[in-house]
Amino acid sequence: MPIKIPNKNRSAVVFPKNRKVLEQLGDNIKLAFKRRGYTQVLISERTGLSRLTIRKIEQGDPKVSIGHYVAVLSVLGLTEGFAGVANDDELGHKLQDIKLMNKQKRISQ
């Protein structure tokens, strides 16, 4: 059986709705730069990322590593908000509660 080697040039499929989310994130980051008076050159120097990568982040490019987005958010002082993205998982809590309630019913029967 042949061993499959992952294709490093393959990128994730990004649906239009999710693409819009990334574009909005890029717009928000770009606006945060402007509000602070930061340039792409300054962000590039502080993160060690190329200006091309910074520009791609501003555009919400899905091919840019999430780590690069976090590096830029860190320079902007915005990582705390990013860390809380999936913190309040209301649907997950409801599903967990249903599962726990079903377990409890089986135990008491």
Predicted features along the sequence, with ranges:
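N-terminal intrinsically disordered/low-complexity leader segments
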Residues: 1-14
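A short, Lys/Arg-rich alpha-helix, primarily the initiator
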Residues: 11-35
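Short alpha-helical DNA-recognition segment
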Residues: 37-55
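Short, basic-rich loop-to-helix N-cap that marks the start of a DNA-contacting helix
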Residues: 61-74
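Short, charged recognition helix plus adjacent turn
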Residues: 83-109
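Short basic helix-loop element that most often maps to the first helix and adjoining turn
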Residues: 27-42, 103-109
